[in-house]
């Protein structure tokens, strides 16, 4: 049985004033308010979402 790779993401900037698609990406990652943390599976789709909003989040 293999372990799934995980990645933790923290929202460090508010998505207010950003594009609607970027706000939707933040919600899609399970992030709500500033400093909220979400632990997700490390997949190419999740990596792409993190890359899209890299100016709003921090990988921890």
UniProtKB/Swiss-Prot annotation:
Q: Which InterPro entries match?
A: Ribo_uL30_ferredoxin-like_sf, Ribosomal_uL30_bac-type, Ribosomal_uL30_ferredoxin-like
Task: From the UniProt record, give one GO term of the biological process aspect.
Answer: translation
Which Pfam families does the entry mention? Ribosomal_L30
Gene3D superfamilies cross-referenced by the UniProt entry: Ribosomal protein L30, ferredoxin-like fold domain
Transmembrane spans: none
Q: Which UniProt keywords apply?
A: Ribonucleoprotein, Ribosomal protein
Q: Which domain of life is it from?
A: Bacteria
Family designation: Belongs to the universal ribosomal protein uL30 family.
What PANTHER family would the database entry show? Answer: LARGE RIBOSOMAL SUBUNIT PROTEIN UL30M, MITOCHONDRIAL RIBOSOMAL PROTEIN L30
Report quaternary structure and partners: Part of the 50S ribosomal subunit.
User: What is the designated name of this protein?
Assistant: Large ribosomal subunit protein uL30
